[in-house]
Curated annotation (Swiss-Prot):
InterPro entries: DabA. One of its GO terms (molecular function) is zinc ion binding. It comes from the Bacteria. Zn(2+) binds at C336, D338, H498, C513. GO terms for cellular component: plasma membrane. Part of an energy-coupled inorganic carbon pump. This is Probable inorganic carbon transporter subunit DabA. It holds the Pfam family DabA. Forms a complex with DabB. Keywords: Cell inner membrane, Cell membrane, Membrane, Metal-binding, Transport, Zinc.
């Protein structure tokens, strides 16, 4: 039986396609494993406040956006959330979304809130009717096809991608008898009779399902959420295409595929589902509206965040334990702003008052597309919000380097051929018997987590094409000004990118540098060092007022965040005159590594000593080689002296910034529109993986299987998982990451900050809708002003009596 909406206006194809596009933009993109980066799972809801987003995603995915009420109640009982924190959060909430009194709020905090399920799909209604798991069957068949279609080199028999996704699926589905065996009669023929293009299929299915115009976007969003990571990998394709001014229809194609299943199921069950389905259509058509329960959850979340902000305010108000020595630094070292660098920076600075560290985005301002030694793959080593502007490669164009490059390519191809031989359909059976014994040594080494021989470093990177002097000078000047490093240079300045060393970890790239697009940061660091050591560039910088002493040398380095070991690329710029400086720096780095490992061992399970850390990096059974950015809570853009000597516990992104040197506030604008946004993606990915792990988390590492080279599934098929594995946010007994929205602290005039927000509505939306908190620091580094939205600020000062940061006045 076919159904159509009675009394509903005729829906044009354009109306349906526009609704499909809006639904596509409501889901987050998912980057492939080779270059995975943190993504804000709520990117499509940035225009909503937390209560409204909670209402929307409850309908679309059946999830909550905050922790269970018991989590907040326990913190209220322990005093971690003070009375003042709760009162302040209550006062800041809209009147229509809060209880009438604070007492009523407290009572609600100790009661479990209701969590209604997502609005039903036809597949779910059909399952409830005859107990056949149609949602599971749909996910299994779509996942089986999608893992081949989206494959990026893992499959031995790859699916051709010359066709659009819908057309490719249609070719497969017309020969797949699994749905009919499960009980969906005539499905293959129904697909064969469907329109050949996705847009026409959308229109056909909408008509058959009887959908109203008001229900389209909400229903489409619901269907895309049922696809898990498959919809998100298609959204990634659209994201990448739009960076180059193009488009991609993969999300619309997947929506057409999912709708085809819905229409086929409705055709099968017909009148038996009509009452339930008509009620569902009406529910989809209703506007999204936050409830009082959503408001209570948001207030409790705000109170937990204000408690953390109160503790941060107290910490920044303390007198630092040590001050930097006056005069020329003995060593300067620039790190990525990554929270893991905070631990190492603090350890390094504690060794000598002459050591100065800086924080800057780990791609060091160089938006490059890099081709590694012996590879043709161009790696985008820059934030995913940007496009590469410069293309680089490894090694000088000399006969010796060219020969080594060819040798590396031949070796890589031989390894790939050997790997395919091991996995081929026939040879794999004989391979184990014939070649198994030669793997005994490797098996023992990996099983016992013994040290491996170090791989040789790539030759020093260089621009693939000659860059003009003006271009090189502009790049150098912009980076130094953005780092607030225009004077007071040490004899030795180290520029440290960061990466991680782990084994048997599909999500290894997620441990690398997010600002480098999921790659390690040594290439950018080495390129910048070469640029700043260039004599012509230095002469040009001097003409712009940036005078680098003749005895200053810059060297690239790599901070391994898993082992806290640092590699210095001294051979890139050999200097006999700096041999003593380099040897002393290496001793300091070794000592700092010991201190940092000791501190991090306290947080890691089964790591009683700092010596246990390197072993974990080599252990192929280790689920938690490091905590990555778990625990991140704050972003601070201020001079280093505001945070130096204070134990931020590896929870803060630290970006050096001195607004007094920033004429026109161009650097501040860059910070707010790039590093802050990247940090928000990281923070909100951790947040989503904790509060909604079933939808925005990657599940259990123990069950992971890599599929298509793009992502992981749990078991042998089904939905592609996105977000972070549970072991990345939980230590087995308790959470390793508190789900708190990021607090952004900036030392700069409020008028300058507000002006930038006014010019960048996308960034302003994140703060206005409280996906991020914003504070302006005063000239002493204290949290003096809180941003309340609509370009308004509240003065906040420490109130020891109430234990809160109270409101004083509006500005």
């Amino acid at each position: 039986m076919l159904m159509t909406a009675t009394g509903s206006p005729f829906l044009t194809a354009e109306t349906i396609i526009v609704a499909a596009d809006r639904a596509a933009r409501a889901i987050p993109p998912l980057w492939p494993l080779a270059s995975s980066v943190a993504v804000n799972p709520f990117i499509g809801q940035a225009g909503d406040t937390l209560p409204t987003a909670a209402a929307r995603l409850r309908r679309a995915a059946g999830i909550a956006l905050t922790m269970p009420r018991s989590w907040y109640a326990e913190r209220l009982r322990s005093g971690e959330i003070a009375e003042g924190d709760l009162q302040a959060a209550f006062d800041a909430a809209p009147a229509e979304l809060r209880p009438k009194t604070l007492a009523a709020l407290k009572q609600a905090a100790h009661a479990q809130g209701t969590r209604p399920p997502a609005l039903p799909t036809v597949a779910e209604l059909a399952r409830d009717l005859d107990s056949i798991d149609w949602p599971g069957i749909v996910n299994d068949r779509i996942g089986h096809w999608a893992s081949g279609y989206f494959d990026q080199g893992q499959a031995l028999w790859a699916t051709a991608q010359a066709q659009r996704a819908y057309a490719a699926w249609r070719t497969v589905a017309t020969h797949d008898l699994t749905p009919e065996i499960a009980g969906l009669a005539g499905f293959a023929q129904n697909v064969a009779d469907a329109p050949a293009d996705a847009e026409a299929a959308l229109v056909r299915c909408v008509t058959r399902l009887g959908l109203s115009g008001a229900a389209l976007e909400s229903y489409f969003h619901r269907l895309l959420m049922t696809l898990g990571g498959w919809g998100q990998i298609a959204r990634y394709r659209l994201w990448q295409a739009e960076l180059t001014g193009n488009t991609d229809a993969s999300v619309v194609d997947l929506l057409a595929i999912r709708l085809t299943w819905e229409a086929a199921l409705l055709r099968q069950y017909g009148a038996a589902l009509e009452p339930q389905w008509q009620a569902a259509i009406a529910a989809y058509a209703r506007p999204v509206a936050a409830t009082l329960e959503d408001g209570v959850d948001a207030i409790l979340q705000e109170a937990a965040e204000r408690a953390a902000q109160r503790r941060l305010h107290s910490l920044l108000s303390e007198t630092p334990s040590a001050l930097a020595a006056p005069g020329r630094p003995a060593l300067q070292m620039a790190f990525c702003i990554d929270v893991r660098s905070e631990v190492f920076r603090r350890a390094l600075e504690s060794l000598d008052p002459g050591i100065r560290t800086l924080g800057f985005a780990g791609f060091f301002g160089l938006g490059i597309g890099h081709r590694r030694f012996g590879s043709d793959v161009v790696e985008a080593r820059l934030p995913v919000l940007l496009r590469p502007g410069v293309f680089t490669c490894s090694g000088e164009a000399t006969p010796a380097i060219d020969k080594a490059d060819l040798t590396a390519r031949i070796t890589a191809r031989a390894k790939r051929a050997w790997g395919r031989f091991k996995l081929a359909a026939i040879s794999s059976f004989a391979f184990v018997e014939a070649a198994g014994p030669i793997y005994v040594g490797r098996l023992l080494r990996d099983g016992l987590a013994l040290p491996r021989p170090s791989a040789p470093n790539d030759p020093a990177p260089r621009p693939a094409d000659d860059l003009g002097f003006d271009t090189r000078l502009g790049m150098a000047a912009n980076v130094l000004r953005a780092m607030s490093l225009t004077e007071g240079f040490a004899r030795l300045v180290l520029l440290a990118g960061h990466g991680a060393s782990v084994v048997n970890n599909p999500h290894a790239s997620a441990l690398h540098c997010g600002a480098c697009g999921g790659y390690s940061g040594e290439v950018n660091a080495r390129l910048l060092a070469a640029l700043l050591n260039d004599r012509d560039v230095r002469a040009g910088l001097a003409s712009q007022g940036i005078r680098i002493p003749d005895d200053t040398v810059f060297l690239g380095a790599l901070h391994d965040t898993t082992t806290d070991e640092v590699t210095v690329y001294a051979a890139d710029h050999p200097s006999v005159a700096h041999a003593g400086d380099l040897e002393r720096a290496r001793r300091w780095l070794t000592s700092a590594g010991v201190l940092a490992r000791g501190e991090r061992a306290l947080r890691l399970p089964r790591a009683a000593r700092s010596q246990d850390i390197p072993h974990r990096a080599r252990d192929w059974a280790e689920l938690r080689p490091e905590w990555a950015l778990a625990g991140c809570q704050a972003f601070v853009a201020a001079p280093r002296e505001r945070t130096a000597g204070r134990d931020l516990e590896g929870r803060a992104f630290l970006h050096d910034y001195d607004w007094r040197r920033d004429k026109g506030f161009g650097v501040l604008e860059l910070i707010l529109t790039a590093p802050v946004v990247v940090a928000s993606w990281i923070s909100l990915q951790y947040y989503g993986s904790v509060v909604a792990p079933d939808v925005f988390g990657a599940g259990n590492k123990l069950l992971h299987n890599v599929t298509g080279g793009i992502g992981v599934v749990e078991g042998n098929g089904g939905l592609l998982r996105s977000g972070l594995p549970w072991q990345s946010v939980h230590d087995g007994e308790q959470l390793a990451h508190e789900p708190l929205r990021l607090s952004v602290l900036i030392e700069a005039p409020r008028e300058a900050i507000a002006g930038i927000l006014e010019r960048h509505p996308g960034v302003r939306t994140l703060f206005d809708n409280r996906w991020l908190h914003l504070f302006a620091l005063d000239d002493e580094g204290h949290m003096a002003w809180r941003y309340t939205g609509d370009l308004r600020w509240e003065n906040c000062s420490r109130d020891a009596a109430s234990g809160r940061i109270p409101l004083r006045e509006l500005a």
